[in-house]
Amino acid sequence: MSREPTPALEYIRSLYAAQDDLLADIAAELKKRNIAIQIGAEEGKLLQLLIALHNAKTIVEIGTLAGYSAIWMARALPEDGHIYAINKDPEHVQMAEGFFARSECRDKITQLAGDAHKILPTLSQKGGGFDMVFIDADKISYPAYLDWAEKNIRKGGLIVADNTFLHGAMFEKAPPEGIAPTTWKNMRSFNERLADKSKYNATIIPTSEGLSVAIKLF
């Protein structure tokens, strides 16, 4: 999730994760619409590094919003790389299409409009074996998205998920006020499943919202 920069974030962004005009325009538009819930620039850079380190070519993004994270990732892909970006809200789909059209990597991004629960099975039918999934969508569905990833991300592939601290609710023994009990329970289940060392080599990077990174071992 994007946030007001601390001195540390400002330093990191200035050295390693400077936004160009396109990324800055996306961030500004989301802020204007009061939906600035995209990842930060430093997290975009981290996604690029993960893609490069794992030689990822095929990525599924669940929750695209205005395309900010998709563009960060697409820029790290090789010439034959591709992202399937799932976006549910029609307003967000339209926004993202406009920004993708301005991007030099627009041919590497296919936006899929609709409910991820309906779209993901169609991607499975294309053969699966994707190199990476980035999950940044409805938190209650994270276990369902992990179910899909377990079947469709290749062995050695990456599962990355944002907001896995659930606004700090994961540090509590019961759902705090403002967090639906089912959402709290499902996020705990998601995190605990990734902690299974027989299936994943995983951790949560302690960003303000928590960014889970897992290598699938099976």
Labelled PLM ranges:
Residues M1-M132, K139-V160, T164-F218:
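A short alpha-helical cap/connector motif
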